[in-house]
Regions:
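Acyltransferase donor/substrate-recognition loop-hinge adjacent to the catalytic core
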Residues: 60-139, 163
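Short, solvent-exposed loop/turn segments at secondary-structure junctions
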Residues: 38-40, 89-91, 181-184, 255
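A structural motif corresponding to the C-terminal lobe/cap of the Radical SAM core domain
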Residues: 266-277
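Short, well-ordered beta-strand micro-motif
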Residues: 83-87, 166-168, 178, 277-279
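Acyl-donor binding region in acyl/amide transferases
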Residues: 1-74, 190-267
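A conserved beta-strand-loop-helix scaffold within acyl/acetyltransferase catalytic domains
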Residues: 113-219
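Short loop segments at secondary-structure junctions
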Residues: 87-91, 170-171, 222
Length: 280
């Protein structure tokens, strides 16, 4: 289930869920999981911790009472997702940079930014990496070529090429990281949502964007225990710093993704928000 909107009334919530469950049962569905808006590749999970922090780009937000409504409707926790906060003043350490250098030299890793002049070709590389590297993750749903193209078209206007990194070994792509400026910082100044003068106001406040969201970061399965993901994490932070970004949110990370949680810990990242997936 997804796109859940409800007043703080259990009877109303129950009516919504009962109707949805009945319809799904008629379609042969035996389990209901969510919120997914509309899938794991989009806005995912219910915010249960971190209500005092504003949502970053493409992350959901909801009233605190939603958890009670969902749980009282018979849903149980199936998985938690973490959002990590990183700041340029605390990310780096001699140990981290030393380990990163060892991994890069051992694996022969190099990094390059997205080539906007070959956007379609780059998109095919990233699509292949995404579907191969993420297929083993819990709840993974393969993205189709059309879905990837549609998402890329939506994001292209705000993409900063230097923040889209492709990791290579022997000139062969083995992983990538996609980070986007947190344009929510600027969007909040366009309260009426109008194109004009909202667009002018948005462009003016765009200068105030000092943070990014690390949306996806991963490597092919054969490199997932090599430390390559951690190196990609560090490389992203270093390039963001050169562009003047002071902080970042890495979201989201599965609670039992040991390697990614360990990488976040090595970079002194702070668990800032928790999102929950429910199932019944």
């Amino acid at each position: 289930f997804g796109f859940f909107e409800c007043i703080n009334d259990q009877k109303v919530a129950n009516a919504l869920f009962d109707t949805a469950k009945k319809w799904l049962k008629e379609k042969g569905v035996s389990a209901v999981r969510g919120p997914a808006n509309p899938s794991v590749n989009d806005e995912y999970g219910l915010l249960i911790e971190g209500f005092d922090k504003p949502p970053v780009i493409l992350m959901p937000y909801n009233p605190p009472y939603y958890a009670t409504l969902i749980e009282n409707a018979g849903f149980k926790k199936v998985k938690d997702l973490y959002a990590y906060y990183l700041h340029q003043t605390t990310v780096y350490s001699d140990k981290l940079e030393r380990v990163a250098e060892i991994v890069k030299n051992r694996e022969g890793m190099s990094f390059r930014s997205l080539n906007m002049k070959k956007f379609d070709d780059e998109l095919k590389i990233i699509e292949k990496l995404y579907n191969e590297a993420w297929q083993y993750n819990w709840g993974a749903v393969k993205m189709t070529e059309d879905e990837f193209k549609a998402l890329a078209a939506d994001l292209k206007p705000i993409v900063v090429p230097e923040l889209v990194l492709i990791a290579e070994v022997n000139k062969q792509p083995i992983g990538f990281a996609l980070s986007l400026p947190d344009i929510n910082i600027a969007l909040k100044y366009n309260k009426k949502g109008r194109l004009l003068p909202g667009l002018i106001r948005l462009l003016f406040h765009k200068k105030k964007i000092d943070g990014v969201r690390i949306i996806v970061l991963g490597v092919l399965k054969e490199y997932q225990k090599s430390g390559a993901a951690g190196v990609l994490f560090l490389e992203t932070a270093q390039r963001a710093k050169k562009l003047g970004y002071n902080w970042g949110e890495a979201s989201w990370v599965l609670e039992d993704n040991v390697m990614m949680n360990r990488s976040a810990d090595l970079m002194n990242a702070k668990k800032d928000k928790t999102y929950r997936l429910y199932q019944c």
